[in-house]
Swiss-Prot record:
InterPro entries: PLipase_A2, PLipase_A2_Asp_AS, PLipase_A2_dom, PLipase_A2_dom_sf, PLipase_A2_His_AS. It catalyses: a 1,2-diacyl-sn-glycero-3-phosphocholine + H2O = a 1-acyl-sn-glycero-3-phosphocholine + a fatty acid + H(+). This toxin consists of 2 subunits: acidic and basic. The acidic subunit is non-toxic, without enzymatic activity and comprises 3 peptides that are cross-linked by 7 disulfide bridges. The basic subunit is toxic, has phospholipase A2 activity and is composed of a single chain. This is Basic phospholipase A2 A. The lineage of its organism: Eukaryota, Metazoa, Chordata, Craniata, Vertebrata. Belongs to the phospholipase A2 family. Group II subfamily. D49 sub-subfamily. GO terms for cellular component: extracellular region. It comes from Crotalus durissus ruruima.
Length: 122
């Protein structure tokens, strides 16, 4: 669920998804094309790929069980879709934390028109 993903991002990075990640680069936020601009954008690209493997699941709105404790995100037991969506979100939030040192404010509201060329394959 998007609100749960936002909480994971905030837990890992101490930044709100909006405005820091919702429109970042070519892949953070809705859709994406071209090459990821940097490590942060690549986290979003990989997250999009992860969701892409879950076509039968309601990735944006399915609510899943998880906890934020002792510095870790733990996905709980749920339906197959819930568990997979949670793992996609957990891995992406941790990736965004690892990419904080190279976060570029210039990519924060990056125009889609500048995302050109073929998309990478997942």
């Amino acid at each position: 669920h998007l609100l749960q993903f936002n909480k994971m991002i905030k837990f890992e990075t101490r930044k709100n998804a909006i405005p820091f990640y919702a429109f970042y680069g070519c892949y953070c936020g809705w859709g994406g094309r071209g090459r990821p601009k940097d490590a942060t954008d690549r986290c979003c690209f990989v997250h999009d790929c992860c969701y892409g493997k879950l076509a039968k699941c309601n990735t944006k709105w399915d609510i899943y069980p998880y906890s934020l404790k002792s510095g870790y995100i733990t996905c709980g037991k749920g339906t197959w879709c819930e568990e997979q969506i949670c793992e996609c979100d957990r891995v992406a939030a941790e990736c965004l934390r690892r990419s904080l040192s190279t976060y570029k404010y210039g990519y924060m509201f990056y125009p889609d028109s500048r995302c050109r060329g073929p998309s990478e394959t997942c």
